[in-house]
């Protein structure tokens, strides 16, 4: 189908094994991630500053959170990412957890060391889920923090509508090679309509093509503008 063909192009652009169009916002993508790896009673390690959609996913599937408290920057008054040492400790204390969820980046643009978290989690037999609601540019910009797929994460939710140019409410759910794509698709059908808006899906396809062809140039200009603003 044309949708499947467009999803294949998206997977290629983002360096994923599979990609799914999400028309219920990244909230639906995050819920799809959690519910793809957790069932009732399963533990999932996550930062305390996760998006409410992750909490809603726990309510829906009955999974149990193991919270890692992020550090605070008291000068800026913002929360930071998860420290590797604290994730390692959470894995040690809860070896039966099914997954680790990482914000890549946080709402304020702060990244955890996702490469090391992926290494630790996979060594413990856990999946890594990345909420990349604010990380679309990581896949196409130059000298950016590492994207979840490049770091080896198993699933990632990407808000194309925030910094990728698609219409509000449109998003991608990316899968790594370790995931059963058909299982993920079935879970997605639990969290969003089976009659997706073609306006939203077309906007995802167009924005994907735009970033694949011009992403480096676009985000280079963004970096130049922000650098200029800082210096002024």
Residue ranges and their predicted role:
Residues 1-25:
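Conserved N-terminal alpha-helix of the aminotransferase class I/II PLP-enzyme fold
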Residues 13-16, 26-232:
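Conserved PLP-enzyme active-site core in the AAT-like
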